[in-house]
């Protein structure tokens, strides 16, 4: 393991859940930002028909 020394500073019982929680929070924030700033993604999730390009 390349970064094995991190577990000398942080216990795995603390570090692993902390890392996984950070990944989940980042994912939710990114998905929320994309859903609120785009118009096509919510429509795609709702299953509406695609608009033909002009």
From Swiss-Prot:
Residues 36-54 are periplasmic. It is found in: Cell inner membrane. GO terms for cellular component: organelle inner membrane; plasma membrane; plasma membrane light-harvesting complex. One of its GO terms (biological process) is photosynthesis, light reaction. It is a single-pass type II membrane protein. GO terms for molecular function: bacteriochlorophyll binding; electron transporter, transferring electrons within the cyclic electron transport pathway of photosynthesis activity; metal ion binding. The keyword Cell inner membrane applies. InterPro entries: Antenna_a/b (IPR000066), Antenna_alpha (IPR018332), Antenna_alpha_CS (IPR002361), Light-harvesting_complex (IPR035889). It comes from the Bacteria. Residues 1-14 are cytoplasmic. The chain crosses the membrane at residues 15-35. A bacteriochlorophyll binds at residue 31. Keywords: Antenna complex, Bacteriochlorophyll, Cell inner membrane, Cell membrane, Chlorophyll, Chromophore, Light-harvesting polypeptide, Magnesium, Membrane, Metal-binding, Transmembrane, Transmembrane helix. Belongs to the antenna complex alpha subunit family. Antenna complexes are light-harvesting systems, which transfer the excitation energy to the reaction centers. This is Light-harvesting protein B-800/850 alpha chain. It comes from Cereibacter sphaeroides. The gene is pucA.
């Amino acid at each position: 393991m390349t970064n094995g020394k991190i577990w000398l500073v942080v216990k795995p019982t603390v570090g692993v859940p902390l890392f996984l929680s950070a990944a989940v929070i980042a994912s939710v924030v990114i998905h929320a930002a994309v859903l609120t700033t785009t118009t096509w993604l919510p429509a795609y999730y709702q299953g509406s028909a695609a608009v033909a390009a002009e």
